Curated annotation (Swiss-Prot):
Protein name per Swiss-Prot or TrEMBL: PR domain zinc finger protein 8
Disruption of the gene: reported phenotype: Knockout mice lacking PRDM8 shows absence of the corticospinal tract, agenesis of the corpus callosum and hippocampal commissure; they have an abnormal itching behavior that results in the formation of skin lesions, and occasionally display an unusual movement in which they walk on their forepaws. PRDM8-null mice also have a non-progressive defect in retinal responses, and loss of rod bipolar and type 2 OFF-cone bipolar cells.
Gly residues bias spans: 192-208, 414-424, 470-489
Subcellular location: Nucleus
Homology family: Belongs to the class V-like SAM-binding methyltransferase superfamily.
Entry superkingdom: Eukaryota
PANTHER family: AGAP007109-PA, PR DOMAIN ZINC FINGER PROTEIN 8
Positions of region (Disordered): 184-309, 397-506
Amino acid sequence: MEDSGIQRGIWDGDAKAVQQCLTDIFTSVYTTCDIPENAIFGPCVLSHTSLYDSIAFVALKSTDKRTVPYIFRVDTSAANGSSEGLMWLRLVQSARDKEEQNLEAYIKNGQLFYRSLRRIAKDEELLVWYGKELTELLLLCPSRAHKMNGSSPYTCLECSQRFQFEFPYVAHLRFRCPKRLHSTDANPQDEQGGGLGTKDHGGGGGGKEQQQQQQQQQQEAPLIPGPKFCKAGPIHHYPASSPEASNPPGSAGAGSAKPSTDFHNLARELENSRGSSSCVAAPGVGSGGSGHQEAELSPDGVATGGCKGKRRFPEEAAAEGGGAGLAGGRARFSERPLATSKEELVCTPQQYRAAGSYFGLEENGRLFAPPSPETGEAKRSAFVEVKKAGRAVGLQEEAAATDGAGGTAEDPDAGGGVAGGGSNGSSTPAAGSPGAPEKLLAPRPGGSLPGRLEGGSPARGSAFTSVSQLGGGGGAGTAGTAGGSGGGQTAASDERKSAFSQPARSFSQLSPLVLGQKLGALEPCHPGDGVGPTRLYPAAADPLAVKLQGAADLNGACGPLASGGGGGLPKQSPFLYATAFWPKSSAAAAAAAAAAAGPLQLQLPSALTLLPPSFTSLCLPAQNWCAKCNASFRMTSDLVYHMRSHHKKEYAMEPLVKRRREEKLKCPICNESFRERHHLSRHMTSHN
């Protein structure tokens, strides 16, 4: 009886949504310009907070008679395809038949778009209906007309309501017939597993009433193929017009399964089904040799134990196999949360099922989960999250550990509650091992879940995963992942680079070169102290002793360079010069003199700043030089760091030597003032 309560609450919420969206329902849209054929509009803005805010809203607006108090004129040639979508697409009225339909709704990239079916003239109303794929997806298959006494061509057999047009009639059968909805609410044993659930009916489990109801539904709809992409969601359970019509009359033992549709995930469901049209069949869980499909629907037409038109979730498969301890279809409502937030809607349908099961379910050592992207069994989708894939890998690595625990059936015929032959398929917790739920819900032996997620398989690489995290996959505590030996994985993962990972700084703590002596002392350079200005300038009288600390980092190497033993500069490293060997501004010279004479000392620049801008022969770009200390840099980022670390508060300590920048940085030709010296240098190149 809980199912009916859930559905009543959902329909009450939808009724409130209808009251809030009266403007959307009673507004017609007219175009102010001609629309060519195959013009595309969209995407349509849908929040998926209710049934009326999903892709089913077009069918829910369909009526025989229109009351249009609002007319909305739209310039369809305006900007299209914005990130927010087109708001007026929600206001387009539903077409009543194919003759007046001029727009077709279809799914692309998980979003709803409209396509013009013909040329639409100016000042013509836009009327939309679903395309062929969405019609099959929403189970809005056209039924044959039921004529009663030569009156209306379309009559509902449940409530005897008559319709003049096809599309409102189909929408009524699918969504709005009160007797159908009431029968769904009043028939809870179709969803409970205590007795003869819908998916647990055996060979003779049905009754005369169920057979009559099935025959009545077969009379309502023609023989058409069953829905390919019907997803049994945990929220809405609505009867379709022809769910079992494709089944032959010989399968009268199976009950009348009312397929249900999760309208919030239909868009991504359709997109997934296009990519993987061929379904991967898992080991059989039903009777005989009829196996269910792991990532798609259970096959229609299976007479014994088949869930016609419904998707088998991992919980349901375990309930039939005897070992999860969940009664029938109740696993859907108890274990799977309602998809309400937008974050939950981003998951793929396969991932939505796998994430909904909070415990792993194995059968003969195979995990009932969507094929992992690491093994190549499924294509990578834009909605797949690496964490979820890592969870599937973590569950697979312990599949062998829980194989012999007794919680899973060893073969399809040995399970206690497996539906087979003509027996009823009721599954109880006593059918399997008593400790099966505890073993399935127990913590995994391979360490904590965050550890497994962090260690993960080195084969998977996310653009947002740090390299160090990927590198730890081979050694920590995550041995036995689905990749191979740990050593090779570590070597392979160390070579991989991520575009979004923060690289290790090539300059150790950004201070590779340290001045050995103070700027004012100017002591002579000893032979073992590395490179001094005497080697660079033989005529220098007072050289600046410079000590190299980790100078190999400038070369790209890893080990530090020894300062003793007559060590010289490595190849391709920047040469070092004392600031006394090139001219500086008078303000800087006065500051240097004051620093040498008094206690006030300037911040010593690092050796990277001791490069003149004129040495272009050293492959140093001239534009990356500091205008305050004449230091040149290979990269602009180094110059930016230098300016922030050395010259941020430099002039705050020397108020006596400040000069106005307008006087100091002025073009001698055109007298234009500049704030920075390199701006003046660029300006001077224009005069050449």
